[in-house]
């Protein structure tokens, strides 16, 4: 490998940023992400106006998070995922919520997975595997991640309510499945205990965040973490 190529590869790993625009007849989505945190922005917002009372937004020197999917509980979950993964993340979505929450939730999962994959770039110099546990009061969840380029998801949250806020509970595992498929990762998430479905869901997203944060962290080398010598 030439010296310029090496420098370019190191720069890409260092930045780990991406911007995704995904437009269909059902949803319009823009996502900006930095896996390393720090400052990000979307210059041309697709949102007609932003509310002043957003609860899925925060900005510090280390992270910028601003989530607007049109589905409040989905915003809350993506916010938790970004916060505890150490990402900076902006999500804007205009979806056909007059139908239901399916297209918006699924497409946000797909677009986030695409953004993650693009920001991650070559799986090199990272741990690849990550495991996370996270409690929320009585609820406890576990997540295991493999940056394998083998998309697969096993999700068992044991949710019993039909809705949490304005989000159908059936769409919560489907969001995670859509994310895993588009990100091309293997993902196992299960809630081990808990009786409050809000707590079960939130602990699952936080556990996933902990697992992803470990998986994308440096392993101290510039090697591909695979016996194949390649993950692509």
From Swiss-Prot:
Enzymatic class: lyase
InterPro entries per UniProt: IGPD_sf (IPR038494), ImidazoleglycerolP_deHydtase (IPR000807), ImidazoleglycerP_deHydtase_CS (IPR020565), Ribosomal_Su5_D2-typ_SF (IPR020568)
GO annotation, biological process: L-histidine biosynthetic process
Catalyzed reaction equations: D-erythro-1-(imidazol-4-yl)glycerol 3-phosphate = 3-(imidazol-4-yl)-2-oxopropyl phosphate + H2O
Keywords, alphabetical: Amino-acid biosynthesis, Histidine biosynthesis, Lyase
Pathway the protein contributes to: Amino-acid biosynthesis; L-histidine biosynthesis; L-histidine from 5-phospho-alpha-D-ribose 1-diphosphate: step 6/9
Transmembrane helix recorded as keyword: no
GO molecular function (one): imidazoleglycerol-phosphate dehydratase activity
Source superkingdom: Eukaryota
Pfam families: IGPD
The EC number(s) this enzyme carries: 4.2.1.19
UniProt family annotation: Belongs to the imidazoleglycerol-phosphate dehydratase family.
Upper taxonomic lineage: Eukaryota, Fungi, Dikarya, Ascomycota, Saccharomycotina
Protein name: Imidazoleglycerol-phosphate dehydratase
């Amino acid at each position: 490998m030439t010296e310029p190529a090496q420098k370019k590869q190191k720069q890409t790993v260092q930045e780990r940023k991406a911007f995704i625009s995904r437009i269909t007849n059902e949803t319009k989505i823009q996502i900006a992400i930095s896996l390393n945190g720090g400052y990000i922005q979307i210059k041309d917002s697709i949102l007609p106006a932003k509310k002043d009372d957003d609860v899925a937004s925060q900005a510090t020197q280390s992270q910028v998070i601003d989530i607007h999917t049109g589905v409040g509980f989905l915003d809350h979950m993506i916010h938790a995922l970004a916060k505890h993964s150490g990402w900076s993340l902006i999500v804007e979505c205009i979806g056909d919520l007059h139908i239901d929450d399916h297209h918006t939730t699924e497409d946000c999962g797909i677009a986030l997975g695409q953004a993650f994959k693009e920001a991650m770039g070559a799986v090199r110099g990272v741990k690849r595997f990550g495991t996370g546990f996270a409690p929320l009061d009585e609820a406890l969840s576990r997540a295991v991640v493999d940056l394998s380029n083998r998309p697969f998801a096993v999700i068992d949250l044991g949710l019993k309510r039909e809705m949490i806020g304005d989000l159908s509970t059936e769409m919560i595992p489907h969001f995670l499945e859509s994310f895993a498929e588009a990100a091309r990762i293997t993902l196992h998430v299960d809630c081990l205990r808990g009786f409050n479905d809000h707590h079960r869901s939130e602990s699952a997203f936080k556990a996933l965040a902990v697992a992803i944060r470990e998986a994308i962290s440096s392993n101290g080398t510039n090697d591909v973490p695979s016996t194949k010598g390649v993950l692509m």
